[in-house]
Structure formats: structure tokens, C-alpha cells
Amino acid sequence: MARSDELQDALDIPVPDDPSLVLDGCRRLLGPNLYGPSPGAVGDALIAGHVPRQVLHAWTGLARRMLAALGWHEAEVRGRTFAGGANLYVPAEVDQLFTAAYLIEAAWAITAHDLLGLAAMPVKPMEEQLRRIAAAEANPPLRDLVATAARKGIDRLLDDDAVTLGHGCGAVTWDSSALPDAPDWTHIHDIPLALVTGTNGKTTTTRLIAAMGQAAGRVAGLSSTEFVRVGDEILDRGDYSGPAGARLLLRDPRLELAVLEVARGGILRRGLPVTRAQAAVVTNVAADHLGQYGIMTVAELAEVKLSVHRALMPGGLLILNADDPAVVRASTHLAVPIAWFSLSPDTAQIAAARDQGAACGWFENGRIVLSDGRNITDLIGVAEVPLTLGGAARYNIENALGAALAARALGLPDAPIRAALSRFRSDPTDNPGRANEFSVKGARVFVDFAHNPHSIAAVT
């Protein structure tokens, strides 16, 4: 098995330099992603002066031919077009992701040469090169270990040089080139795990769930756009809302409960880092960071955010904002358990959930109310939740609802959920950069990280 640094430049593919057909990037996806539940690779093409759908058709055809040459007969290529371009995704085994990326690039180069009227690139020599790379990259022990973990219901974390089975206090990590023949599974296990995504409110909701875990006496940790923390210890500061943050957190042996803030960029660049979360929250979806990786509209962005459902374990709960039209529209095709939350008990999704005996949460008469599908619980009044500023910060009522439903899905009792809500504050200690209030020369000054029109509207 070749190491990742040896595979980075294993094949030099002559991609045409023409502004009308540009391969803007090709990257490996280490876990579930926008396109499907499996790891793989995806390429982004920028197309001008050609019909994107026709270009994608030709690109897909070459990719399928090369997959057949590799013997990957079960790999289902997926493509999508967007305004001014196309994406092509190829699923692959965990030890064939470089090969999949090279295949996408090779198929693009041959397609572009043809469409631009350049000298034809021979296909068979390229297929031989791909077979060589596939053989060099192959790591049967890694593939077998990951497959066995999946059969046992145990999650995995992957990077270029290591593999981890389980989470936190139940995790074991090996170098990918020195895997055990027969690992001792006795103490390998997952821990309660939630994902949080959305345009705004991700970090606050992530911090809230972790605070609920701590209130329940667990060693709770989180990864976020600002830091990775286990208990009260910050392991590192920076934007850790992608797979690197998840690995840093979930490999800590002290950890008993985890919350991952999952940003759009991490999902699109590397896929989701885990496969067996118990809960995933989508706070909302609004225009932000559009125009990257082929995501041009709010509707397309909603599809990216809701792809977190692919990282849920069987029976895991997807927790969605019923007051967000983009979230509601993007959820219609999903076949996973959904818990809706809303600022009104009369929202259609809340009414339907209550009729169907499904979990949900809502705001009514100044109270945060939860239902497990059988029993309704008056959890707490917003006057007792400092984060809501007496109910004025309605966006934080939504965040509290999503966090409470996630905490329940992680198996936490209502008492610590209620306790965390009553203690957690919008101050630089509990929630830095989020509606932090200061007194300056007799004036009340609020500092908030609001950075897009949706968040600015929410805090004004």
C-alpha cells in the first residue's frame, strides 16, 4: 500500500487549458456526502459556451468506461449540473479514493480534448495507469477492518494515514499501514454523538447540547468554527467545523458525549466524518457562501445541509426547523425519522407530528414544550432561559428547541436539559461572539458574530 504522499502526484493528466471547459477541482470525500452514503471522489467543472448537460453526459460515459476497466462494476456514477457547470461523483472503497479522483480527472481530460477538437487522448493507456494506481493504493486490511466495524455497528474515522474505530473513551486508532489482523473488539464502542449544521445558529446549538451533556455528568466535548473542547479544556483554537475537528475531538479518550458543528465547506470538501450519529440538527438555511463547489442557490444549499441525514445510525433522528421554508422543501424526499421544531404549535409539521405520534418541539405561551410522540412536557419558560433575552431573541428559542430535542435523542433526561437552559448565557464565557452584552459609559452594547443578511435580520 502506497502512502498518501506517494499517491498525491502518482499520475500527471494533461487537462486542456481552455476557459470554456475548466476542471475547477477534484477531491476525495471520506464519508457520507451530498451525493450518497459512501466515500468517493467528486470533480467540479466550469462550463462556458457548451451545454452543461451534454458535457456531463460525455464525462459520465468516459467515467463509466474506466470504472468497467477497473472492475468497479457496482459503482454508481452520479452527476449534477448547475448554472455554468457540472459535478461528477464516483463512489469508491475507503482504500481507493485517490484512484477515484484520478479517474474523474482522466475522464474529464479525454472529454475536454474531444469537445475542444484537440488531438484525441488514448483511453487504454490511461486505464492501465489507473489500474496501476488502484493496485498501489489498495489496502485490503483497512477495507476489511472498516467493513467488520460496520457489521458490528461501530463507527470509523479516516484520514490519510490513520483509522479510528469507535469514539472517545471507546476509540482505538491504528496507522493505516500497520493494522491488526484480529483486533480486540471488547472495549471498542461509540458514544452519544450529535451533528449540528445550518446557516446560522450552529455554534450556539452545538454549545448548548454540550452544556446539556455536562449538566448530565458526562465528559462532553464539541468541535466548532472556533475551537475543539473536551470538558472545560480547549484542545485547539481555529475553524474545526470539518473532519479534522471531528477526528481531534473523537480521538480523545476522555470523551463520553460529543457534538460536531458541521459546516457546508467541510461537507462539500471532504464529506461527513462519521456514519453513526444518533441525532443531527439543521437550524436553518439562508443565502450564504453561494457560488462554491457548484452550489448556486438556497435550494441547493439546503440539499447540502440536509445531507447530514446520511451520517445517522439506523433509527437516528433528524431534527429540523419547521419555520424554515427551504428546510421544509428539502426534507420532502427523506426517509429517516424527523423531529420538527417551531415557534408555533400550529405549524403544519408540528400538527402532523403530534397526530402521527412523532417527536417534536414548539414554543407556546412563553414556554418551550417537547413531545416524545406520547407525552407532552412543559420543559421551561423562556423567562428562565437567559439565552433568549426574555424571549426577545426568538432565534435562540429555536436553537434551544433544536438542542433540547437533540439532547433527548442522545438519551439525556429532561432535568439536565432544563438545568443547562437555565444556566447557559449569551456572554463571552458560555457563548462568545453571540449577542454578548456590555455596558459602556451607561449604554448597552451588544456584540454578535452576525455575518450574513439572515443573521443580521435576526438580531435587529
Predicted regions and their residues:
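Walker A (P-loop) phosphate-binding motif
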Residues: A182-F227
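Long, compositionally biased, glycine/small-hydrophobic-enriched stretches that function as flexible linkers
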Residues: M1-P141, A147, L158, A162-G168
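Flexible active-site lid/hinge loop adjacent to a nucleotide/diphosphate
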Residues: V230-W340, P345-Q349, E384, P453-A457
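Short polybasic amphipathic segments
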Residues: A162-G166, E226-R229, N365-N375
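N-terminal pre-Walker A segment at the start of P-loop NTPase domains
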Residues: T164-L179
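Adenine nucleotide phosphate-binding catalytic loops in nucleotide-utilizing enzymes
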Residues: I295-A302, L306, V336-A457
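Buried hydrophobic packing segments
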Residues: L145, I209, G213, L249, ...
